[in-house]
Amino acid sequence: MGKKEQVEQLTTYMANFVSYIGKVLPDDIKAKINELAEKEDSPLSKVIYQTMQRNQVLAKELNRPSCQDTGVLQFWVKCGTNFPLIGELEALLKEAVVKATFEAPLRHNSVETFDEYNTGKNVGKGIPTVFWDIVPDSDKCEIYTYMAGGGCTLPGKAMVLMPGEGYEGVTKFVMDVMTSYGLNACPPLLVGVGVATSVETAALLSKKALMRPLGSHNENERAASMEKLLEDGINAIGLGPQGMGGKYSVMGVHIENTARHPSTIGVAVNVGCWSHRRGHIIFDKDLNYTITTHSGVTL
């Protein structure tokens, strides 16, 4: 297969993948929704979870997006330097989004700032957003695909703390965000927390945390312990499904961190709603693929 045919093939694969994740939730998210539905005991909570579950069934049966807000497309690309299409990836991902927009279909969610017009294709300046991790001497390419909806994006916040505020300050920041904005972000939520030096590094980490599978933990024992403490604390707020009250407010809390400057603690929060539409696909150099987030899928 020549390079032109490879580009066309990968574009089609990614367009189909984007379309699919807008309609079918990842396996771990579906399992968590079912788990929380069993654990909640209030009649209203159970009705809401039953509605969520029914929504997923209908989305797949009718081949329609599971939420009308199909978000802005964001891609985390972990690509080997020897992957044959590394130089074509950004352009073909943009083309894949356009293709998916009309085939899925996806709601038109790309508004050019300052000019204030909708492009009608879900692409624009900097959209879709592509974040890169380059892997030396590898010929594989991993792509995390995420639909960033408006409701779950609104609570996003970042700031830099004085070092004396410590991890108590990080906890207070996260809890302040959740008590102020979590209600309207379509809980139960997946909460991503980034801890680093500055606002931009912490913010990127907090979004990257949302790509992790449910049930995973930070490799640092102290950070993993903080994930559990924050999860328990946010659940105690009692947001419940759709903010209507209940025992469980979150599907999980994921912390990603780097080393930091001794004089600062950068912290950020990003959240994913109950309809957490993310996908993870791995390509080898011949474009054979493995999908880790959704079982039984053929593109």
Predicted regions and their residues:
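Non-transmembrane, aqueous-exposed alpha-helical and coiled segments at domain scale
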Residues: 1-299
